[in-house]
Structure formats: C-alpha cells, structure tokens
Design a protein with these regions (language model features):
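A broadly used, surface-exposed interaction patch
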Residues: 386-388, 430, 481-485
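A long, amphipathic alpha-helix that forms part
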Residues: 57, 370-373, 412-456
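Flexible internal linker/loop segments at domain or repeat junctions
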Residues: 403-424, 473, 498-504
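Active-site-proximal alpha/beta segments of enzymes that process anionic O-linked groups
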Residues: 167-241, 246-413, 488, 517-547
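Membrane-interface soluble catalytic domains
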Residues: 2, 6-22, 38-42, 62-69, ...
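Transmembrane and membrane-interface helices of multi-pass
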Residues: 1-190
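Active-site rim elements
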Residues: 40-43, 189, 301-304, 356-359, ...
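Histidine-centered active-site microenvironments of extracellular/periplasmic hydrolases
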Residues: 256-260, 452-453, 457-500
Length: 577
C-alpha cells in the first residue's frame, strides 16, 4: 500500500501584504506625513509617496519566496535616499527638493562631503540610528506575499500600468503633450517617493549641463551684440572683476559690524577716495551657479533662461577686443564638466588653482595673487581679468590658516543662546571674513601698484546665514526659507587715477541705491563705456538714469516662488541690510 504526501499550496495573506506595504511606504511616507503635520504642505506628498512606493511590490509579487532578499537590496537604496531627505528636513525645516539636488550635483561630491561634516551632530546620528532600527524591524516582519499564477502577473501589470504606463499613454497619445513634458510631469509626481527625487534631479542636472556645454561649443556661432560701441576706443586698459563667495556684508566691519573683520578694506576706504563702497546691493539667488547665470549674462529672475541664448559678459568683452582671463580658486573636477568651467572656458586663458581632491583642504585664496600678477604683466593692450575666490565658503575654518583664528573663543557681539559648536562656526565665519579681507585688499593694492588704466569691481555671489537671524539657529542658505543675510552682499568699485582722468565720475550719490546683482551686466557695460542694443542705463546702478525696481529673489522656475527682497523681515542687523 502506497501513501502520497500532498504539499499544501501557500495561501495569500493580507497580513503579509500589509507588512510589505508598510515596509516600502516607511521610506517615503514617514517624511511626507511629518511635513503635512507641520503644516508645510498638503496631502499630495503623502498620496504620491504611497502610490509610487507601491511600485516596489511588483518584484515581491513576482518572486514571493525571495521577498527578504529583494526587500533588502531595494531597501538599502531607499534607506540611503530617504535618510538624506529626512536629515535635510531636520536641519532646515524644509522638504528636500530638486532645486537642492541641482545645487548638490553641481557642487560635486567633495563639497557635499564637506557639508555633511559641517552638519554632522549627535542629534543627526541618533535620528539615523533610530530610523535604521525601525527599517530593520520592519524588514524582519516580511513574509512571502503569495498570489497564484497567473494573477500575480495581472496584479503586477495593473500596478505598472496604473502608475506609469497609463499617465504616459494618456498625456502623449490622448492629450498630445510632448513626450519630454509627459516625463517631466510623471517625474514630478514620483518625486516624493525615494529614490526618485535623486534620479529626476540628476536627469534635470544632466539636461542643463548639456545645454551649457552646447552653448560653449557653439559660442562662436552666437550672434554678436548689435550696434556695439566702445567709447574708450583702442586705448590700453585693464578691467578686473573679483567674484567672492558666501560673504554677507553684515559680518564686515566695512559695513558697520562691531568686530573688526575687514581692517585692510576699512583702511583703504578711509585713505583711498577711489574706493567706493555700495551699501544696498543684494543677490537674487543664494547659490553660486544660479546667480552667476544671471550676474554674468542678461538673464534675471523674470527671464532666467537668457543665459542660454544671449552673449555673456565674457563674450561681450571679447567682442570689444579684450583678451580675457579667468583665475579661480574654486575646485574644478575636470576642465570641462561643471557649469563654472563652462563660463571660465568662454575666456581666452584659464588658471585653475585648486587641484585638491577634496575641498576640505587648506587651499587658500592667496593662490590667486601670483597668477593675477602674471596676467597684469601680460602685454595685451586690453585685458579683462575675472578672479573667482572661495571666499568664506562653508566649511569656514578651511578658508584661513590655522594660526590666524583671531576670533577663536571670542564671545563679544555674539547672538544669545549659541551652543559651543554654533559659537565655533560663528567665530570661524568671522575668521574667514578676516582672511577674505586680506585677499580682496591685496588684489586692489596689487592692481593699484601696476599703475593701470581701468577699474576693479568686487562682489560676493551671495550671502550666508550664520546664526544672525532670530532665533539664531539657522546656518547656510535655503531659498525656500530666506533671510536677509543670505542675500546681502558687499559691492565695491575701485577706479585708477588714469581711468578717472579720462572717465571722471562721482559715485558718492549712488552708494545707497537699491540694486540687484542680477542686473550687473548693465552696470559693467556702463562703467566700461560699452553700448549696444539691449543695454539699459536705467538698470545700471552708477547711471544718472537709474531707476529702482523690485529686487526679486527666489527660484524663477518654481510657480509663485518669486518674492520682493525688501519684504523680508529685518531681524538683527548692522549697517544697511
């Protein structure tokens, strides 16, 4: 007599499905729920995170007996992406957006690691450990979600069709929208779910970079500025543009800050009548790439894409017959693959002074002084020299020699309630300003010593919030949560005796005018004596026809994101903020 053992078929379990959903939802929906509870956003983020996190159920349905392996592999990716977004929210109180990702991708991994070290704290470590522990606990509860064949294929396809294929088909074939627009809309819906915000952000970054690379490759094909005139003719001259970094004027004694952070510029201002200090210039965007796309071109907050289609300041000066130079102490990954490098390559000769593998290295801005001297001695009759500094860029203590920490441990004129770590950063920033003062003053002095015919303009690309605004707990820059200190910048003009002799002008009546750095190209054209179709004297801060207009700040690519800088609350301040 033979006996047969019948193996029972596995049954579908709602409990197993529930744990699988909870596991995948955890990585995205937790943060969206926190954002909703805080009142920062509505329910769309929760809805989309729930929907698109459910896509990870497809491999679980198709291979139920391998759920632990599948969930572990996918979970590591989701954990890393979602933890980064959660920590960003803890630090800034804002959602991790594509705009932030764009800045991260452009600044390169070395700079990103420097940001991580700046914000590394016990609080972040504890949050990360707790977050990881919950994720691991949920993973241990996973069991096979068994759906009989062929229904597992039907359910999996239904998920894929409902969330991905149907929106694409509907928008592309029924509504006749461009396929690229359809993908952009879908990516926007998927963004609240990890790790799609990283993938869509990188996709947009590559698109933007390709556009700029194309602009560089086709630079000679751009039509020159029409009806172009240079009132100075062919007389030899040298013009200098110094671009600072992360330096807000409210922390400069030159602008009334009680700590002596700019002694050399203070002395120059008192003794040299040719140095003009403008008191009311603000940047339009608190990020280097985004503001230089405006300051060095005809783009602005209302027309942010003109940098792609119209000549830049570098193109304009080459059209005027200048030999152009770019000297930078900003880190460059390669000579061609960053947006800053695209701008620099529009000049005739470049000096890349920072070759460190990591930005967390003591590579000081005094690096630019020797090549600056070399370029001053170049025999070209007409020269434009652009100098790009690291300035007071985070991490501040790397911007000055270790033995020059004048304000280390100093508690004078410090906001109340700072922790020891915050006080250290506050003082480091002032030390960085002190060293930046030496570099900028040295550039002016070296330029003056060359007995040039020309002028020098210095500004910082944007400011920096370093516990300046009550409740004194914010450091860095966040366009979605702006403070005045993120936008207030120094703006200096030094003119040589020879230039003044042939271009006599009194700027004393101009120094308090409200001005946006986004309009720089018009001021530069005015100073250089250039005119052309598109030049607008009402947008030059040194022109008698100047008209004050709204100083827009914010992300111009985000709906209803532009705001008037002058509506921002003041908080604590010094000087003209």
């Amino acid at each position: 007599m033979h006996s047969t053992e019948v193996q029972a078929k596995p049954l579908f379990s709602w409990k197993a499905l529930g744990w699988a959903l909870l596991y995948f939802w955890f990585f995205s929906t937790l943060l969206q729920a926190i954002i909703y509870i805080s009142g920062y956003s509505g329910t769309n983020g929760i809805r989309d995170s729930l929907l698109f996190s459910s896509l990870w159920l497809i491999p679980v349905f198709l291979f139920p007996m391998r759920i632990k392996i599948i969930a572990a592999v996918i979970g590591v990716v989701l954990w890393a992406a979602s933890l980064a977004a959660l920590c960003y929210y803890v630090i800034y109180g804002q959602e991790f957006s594509q705009s932030v990702l764009f800045v991260m991708f452009e600044t390169n991994t070395n700079e990103a690691s420097e940001y991580l070290s700046q914000y590394f704290s016990l609080k972040i470590v504890l949050i990360a450990l707790a977050y990881t522990a919950v994720a691991v606990l949920l993973w241990t509860r996973l069991r096979p979600v068994y759906i009989p064949k062929p229904w597992r294929y039907v359910v999996s396809f239904a998920l894929l069709y409902g969330l991905i294929l149907h929106p694409i088909a509907m928008n592309t074939f029924i509504k006749n929208k461009p396929f690229e627009k359809t993908l952009d809309n879908l990516a926007s819906r998927m963004e609240p779910a990890a790790p799609w915000q990283f993938l869509t952000g990188y996709y947009q970054y590559r698109q933007q970079l390709n556009s700029l690379t194309k602009l560089l490759n086709e630079n000679n094909a751009l039509p020159p500025l029409a009806n172009f005139k240079d009132e100075s003719g062919n007389e030899p001259r040298t013009l200098v543009l110094v671009i600072g970094e992360s330096t807000q004027r409210g922390r400069m004694s030159l602008y009334g800050y009680p700590r002596e952070t700019t002694p050399e510029l203070d002395a120059l201002h008192k003794t040299d009548p040719n140095l003009t200090v403008f008191n009311n210039v603000v940047t339009s965007r608190p990020y280097t790439i985004e503001i230089l796309q405006q300051a060095l071109t005809f783009a602005n907050e209302k027309n942010p894409d003109l940098y792609l289609t119209q000549p830049s300041l570098m193109n304009m000066m080459k059209q005027a017959g200048y030999k152009t130079f770019w000297i930078t102490n900003q880190q460059t990954m390669t000579a061609r693959n960053t947006m800053l490098t695209v701008f620099s390559r529009q000049t005739d000769k470049q000096y890349y002074m920072n070759q460190q593998r990591t930005q967390s290295a003591r590579e000081y801005d005094t690096n630019v002084l020797k090549p600056f001297q070399d370029v001053l001695n170049d025999p070209a009759p007409k020269k434009l020299i652009i100098v790009h500094l690291l300035g007071t860029h985070i991490k501040y203590k790397y911007r000055y020699p270790e033995n020059q920490g004048k304000f280390d441990g100093n508690t004078d004129h410090v906001p109340p309630g700072l922790s020891a770590e915050e006080l250290e950063s506050y003082n480091d920033y002032d030390n960085a300003n002190l060293y930046n003062d030496h570099v900028v003053a040295s550039l002016i002095k070296d330029f003056k010593a060359a007995d040039p015919n020309g002028f020098l303009v210095y500004f910082s690309d944007h400011g920096e919030e370093v516990y300046d605004t009550p409740p004194h707990k914010t450091q860095g820059r966040n366009e979605d949560n702006p403070t005045r200190h993120m936008y207030t910048i120094p703006f200096l003009l030094w003119t040589s005796e020879k230039w003044q002799a042939t271009h006599p002008r009194d700027f004393s009546q101009d120094v308090d005018r409200k001005y946006s750095l986004a309009e720089l190209i018009h001021t530069w054209s005015d100073l250089a004596g250039l005119s052309y179709d598109g030049y607008d004297p009402t947008r030059s801060v040194v022109n008698p026809q100047f008209k004050e207009t709204t100083r827009w700040i914010g992300n111009p690519y985000k709906k209803n994101a532009l705001i008037d800088y002058d509506t921002l609350p003041y908080g604590d301040q010094v000087g003209n903020q």
